Curated annotation (Swiss-Prot):
Protein keywords: Activator, Cell cycle, Phosphoprotein, Transcription, Transcription regulation
SUBUNIT field: Interacts with transcription complexes SCB-binding factor (SBF) and MCB-binding factor (MBF) at their target promoters. Interacts with MBP1 and SWI6.
The name this protein goes by in its record: G1-specific transcription factors activator MSA1
Modified residues (Phosphoserine): S268
Summary of the function given for this chain in its UniProt record: Activator of G1-specific transcription factors, MBF and SBF. Promotes both the timing of G1-specific gene transcription and cell cycle initiation. Associates with SBF- and MBF-regulated target promoters and this binding is maximal during the G1 phase, prior to maximum budding. Affects cell cycle initiation by advancing the timing of transcription of G1-specific genes. Overexpression advances the timing of SBF-dependent transcription and budding. Depletion delays both indicators of cell cycle initiation.
Superkingdom assignment: Eukaryota
One GO-annotated biological process of the protein: traversing start control point of mitotic cell cycle
Organism: Saccharomyces cerevisiae (strain ATCC 204508 / S288c) (Baker's yeast)
Intrachain disulfide bonds: none
Biased composition (Low complexity): 261-277, 455-475
Polar residues compositional bias, start-end: 21-37, 245-260
Residue spans of biased composition, Basic and acidic residues class: 614-629
Cellular component per GO, a single term: cytoplasm
């Protein structure tokens, strides 16, 4: 089959049987299109440019002055009047005209070079109105006016043709400055124009033009098409305008300034921000955004963020914990207030209130709601978030194995499997020794060891007098029970198969923890260190287990400020007359020595003397702990 007969899909046979491909019909048509392409595409552009009339048409309208209808018909289109005039129009404007009211003077005025810029600001149809033709005697009285592009209106005001539209503000200033002088000169010019005296009129107009040029009022003149006002009306306006401006400008301005000065204090951002309620009270987004709820603090979650100055105070208190523990204990309430409830420190209704323990405890109650949001990133505020130190404490803390099988509740945030590691995890003590925690009875020993290590750390770094003050601070709780200890009666199961030497070793190792844990224990009140809820049997009171401290993840437990916050924020007045030291202090008195007291003996001691000899119990436990070591 011939290759010339084979057709390719989608392409016509351009080189069909032609020896020269350029002779094919399609090649010929394509060459023609290429040749005609630039011209054909340039024609629409030329047509767009030729939409305005050509100079020949303008010459016809200027030369043949008798054809007024044609100029009127074409004058309706703005393009005719906006086009650039030719030189012939200016020469025709200088030719002598018999009468000023003739059609020649009218056409000469409309199509002169100086009138072109004036007509740009108004529709051309206005020039052909009968009212405009009736006023030709007044507006164009002589040839020299057209030559100088100056017209005089019926009110006797001199107007330069080709100026910008006349604004009221410029009119008022113009009338205020040259009121009497211009009226006198305009009346003389108007009388001279009626007498048809070109030479005298020329001198007057030249002098007036020079005066107006010096005063720079060329751009603020009225238009000829504007309806002329009567002289009496203009005089009234001239006399009223200065009084209006003088009497109203300064008092209004001063009154506005006074209003602004008086209205600035209530409109200041701090006052408006203080009265603004939280946009989303119980959502987890506002914890990150830093909204401060100032209303309904008892029902909404505590979502305030601490300012930079608050952070500096908290950091300085943390740094001073190693050197001086008395100042830390004295500032415990301040740290609690700054850490968990900055609304007490920052809100407007609490700025004047003293930072008392009762106010801090009331604010600490709302801190529980913050942990029920379910977002682990929202457990701590970004303001107190010293994240490298927190992560270091998480990785080096010896308390990571604490995870109790308590039923989930609204406060049980750290339920098993959520944040806590497995139970059989190894706990690094001092970075060298490893102590494997078992589930059978080790929980209560670890709690006791933490409390004793706390007391021992405080006692070893201070004098006996300071020790007494610290123990008073630790042992005197507020008259309400903590949420962690829901029942008043505590029955502790006896720990099986564990020797006293192992218990004492746990006590000793618990004391040698990292600096962050030591600081945390130094700031932690002993009222919050108790056995978990699954070791309790409640006789009355709330049945929901509330050991929030050890159910929380290790990020909260190992940060000093957050630990201080959690120890104070979970206190709720459920059962008056009971305290946490009822369960913790007698345990220190009897359990480490191995007296073998039954749980009922502890209950009896709690019932008989709940608040007596708290300092003696702490001292006795401390001495026995040191003797065992």
């Amino acid at each position: 089959m011939d290759k010339s007969m084979i057709k390719k899909r989608g392409r016509p046979p351009i080189t069909k049987d032609y020896p020269n491909p350029l002779q094919s019909p399609m090649a010929h048509s394509s060459m023609q299109v290429q040749k005609q392409g630039p011209h054909s595409f340039a024609k629409p552009l030329m047509k767009v440019g030729q939409s305005s009339p050509s100079p020949n048409k303008r010459r016809l309208s200027i030369d043949h002055h008798h054809n007024l209808a044609a100029t009127t018909r074409k004058g309706r289109y703005r393009g005719v009047l906006l086009s650039t005039p030719t030189k012939k129009s200016s020469t025709n404007g200088s030719t002598p005209i018999s009468t000023p009211s003739s059609n020649d003077s009218y056409n000469n005025t409309v199509f002169s070079e100086t009138r072109k810029t004036f007509l740009q600001s108004s529709p051309p149809i206005m020039t052909s109105s009968p009212a405009f033709q009736k006023k030709n005697d007044y507006m164009f009285p002589s040839q020299e006016q057209f030559k100088l592009s100056l017209t005089i209106t019926e009110s006797g005001k001199a107007v330069i043709a080709g100026s910008l539209p006349f604004s009221p503000s410029s009119k008022s200033s113009h009338l205020m400055n040259n009121n009497n002088k211009k009226i006198m000169q305009n009346e003389k010019i108007h009388k001279g124009s009626k007498k048809n005296a070109p030479k005298f009129e020329k001198r007057r107009i030249l002098s007036l033009l020079k005066q107006m040029k010096n005063e720079k009022y060329c751009d603020t003149d009225t238009l000829p098409e504007a309806p002329p006002a009567k002289p009496s009306r203009s005089d009234i306006i001239d006399t009223e305008l200065p009084t209006i401006i003088e009497t109203s400008a300064s008092p209004i301005g001063s009154a506005r300034n006074n209003n602004i000065l008086l209205s600035q204090p209530p409109q200041s951002p701090p006052s408006s921000a203080q009265l603004k309620p939280p946009s989303t009270p119980k959502s987890s987004l506002q914890f990150r955004m830093g909204f401060t709820p100032n209303v309904a603090l008892n029902s909404v979650s505590l979502s305030d963020t601490i300012s930079k100055s608050t952070n500096a105070v908290g950091a300085s208190n943390n740094n001073n914990q190693n050197g001086n523990s008395i100042s830390n204990i004295a500032d415990a309430n301040t740290l609690l207030t700054l850490t968990n409830s900055p609304g007490v420190f920052l809100s407007p209704r609490n700025k004047m209130l003293p930072k008392s323990t009762t106010a801090s405890n009331e604010q600490q109650q709302e801190f529980v709601f913050k942990f029920s949001s379910g977002d682990p990133l929202l457990l701590t505020d970004d303001a107190d978030g010293n994240w490298p130190e927190m992560l270091f404490n998480v990785s080096n803390t010896p308390r990571r194995q604490k995870c109790f099988n308590t039923p989930p509740s609204w406060i049980n945030f750290g339920s098993p499997g959520l944040f806590s590691p497995p139970r059989s995890s190894n706990v690094m003590v001092n970075g060298t020794t490893v102590a494997t925690a078992s589930d059978s009875g080790n929980v209560h020993r670890q709690l006791q060891a933490q409390l004793e290590a706390q007391v021992q750390v405080q006692s070893q770094s201070n004098s006996p007098t300071q020790r007494q003050q610290q123990q008073r601070q630790f042992q005197i709780p507020p008259p309400h029970i903590n949420m962690n200890s829901s029942p008043p009666q505590i029955n502790i199961a006896s720990p099986p198969h564990q020797s006293m030497s192992r218990v004492s070793s746990i006590y000793f190792n618990k004391e040698k923890t990292t600096t962050g844990v030591a600081n945390m224990l130094g700031n932690t009140k002993s009222e919050n260190l108790q056995p978990p809820a699954n070791l309790f049997t409640a006789a009355h009171g709330p049945s929901t287990p509330r050991n929030q401290e050890f159910q929380l993840p290790t990020l909260i437990e190992c940060t000093p400020l957050i630990q201080q916050t959690m120890n104070g924020s979970l206190g709720t007045k459920y059962i008056p007359g009971t305290s946490i030291s009822n369960s913790a202090t007698p345990n220190l008195h009897g359990f480490p020595v191995g007296t073998g007291k039954a749980p009922s003996s502890f209950d009896d001691s709690l019932k008989q003397n709940p608040y007596s000899n708290k300092q003696d119990d702490a001292r006795t436990a401390l001495k026995r702990l040191i003797d065992d070591q």
